[in-house]
């Protein structure tokens, strides 16, 4: 099926945002922002769950219980993500890379399911990863699932209200192309937060050495989102 023309730039933006985040988390290279590749060390488990300030929300072993200000560990399995019911505290707690990455992956997985899947996944059934490699793989799989939902759409589907029945938002009241735009913003802004936390962890001594420009092209080895693997033109 031909991709609707108005979906093309949003799909390209999504592919690029996912590829850039994957490379920024696990390397071996990432784009410096000027087209110069820089070497990137893989994110460690310690960094993934690093709490830079007191009172962070994170992903925790269920046996350890929720973190400060949380009263529930959301998800299924050994690890849960800090949350609070009926409402989150204000101001919101500072969140770790683990929390932010789990949030993005859950959102993509559930939205894909509630668009082209069984329409039955919930945040309580999502399995969080306690290690960095598992979390990055989960993000890659979630991104692929959401991309699959996008490329299944024809032009009429983009204007359909309630095509996504994702329960943790206003999806049932929104045209689908607005949801596509919103999901891109979620990946972009949380991806930027994760990149900044990696920088902060590095300068606080968690990683040795300084990043230096390296030879070669843009790191195309990451299992991204089905795009071309390179930087979009322009």
What feature does the model see in each segment?
Residues 127-163, 177-191:
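Acidic/histidine-rich alpha-helical segments that form the ligand environment
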Residues 1-126, 164-234:
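Short, contiguous alpha-helical
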């Amino acid at each position: 099926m031909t991709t609707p023309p108005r979906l093309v730039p949003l799909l390209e933006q999504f592919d690029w945002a996912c590829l850039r985040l994957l490379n920024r988390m696990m390397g071996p290279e990432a784009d410096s922002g000027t087209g110069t590749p820089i070497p990137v060390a893989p994110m460690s488990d310690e960094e993934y769950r690093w709490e830079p300030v007191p009172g962070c929300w994170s992903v925790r072993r269920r046996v350890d219980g929720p973190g400060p200000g949380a009263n529930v560990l959301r998800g299924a399995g050994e690890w849960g993500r800090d949350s609070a019911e009926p409402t989150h505290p204000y101001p919101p707690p500072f969140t770790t890379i683990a929390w932010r990455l789990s949030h993005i992956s859950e959102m993509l997985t559930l939205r894909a399911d509630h668009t082209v899947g069984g329409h039955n996944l919930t945040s309580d059934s999502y399995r969080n990863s306690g290690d960095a490699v598992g979390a990055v793989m989960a993000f890659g799989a979630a991104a692929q699932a959401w991309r699959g939902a996008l490329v299944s759409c024809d032009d009429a589907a983009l204007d359909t209200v309630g095509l996504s029945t994702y329960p943790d938002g206003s999806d049932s009241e929104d045209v689908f192309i607005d949801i596509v735009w919103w999901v891109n913003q979620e990946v972009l802004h949380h991806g930027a937060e994760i990149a900044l936390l990696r920088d902060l962890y590095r300068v606080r001594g968690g990683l040795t050495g300084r990043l230096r420009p390296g030879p070669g092209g843009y790191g195309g080895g990451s299992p991204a989102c089905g795009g071309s693997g390179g930087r979009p033109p322009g």
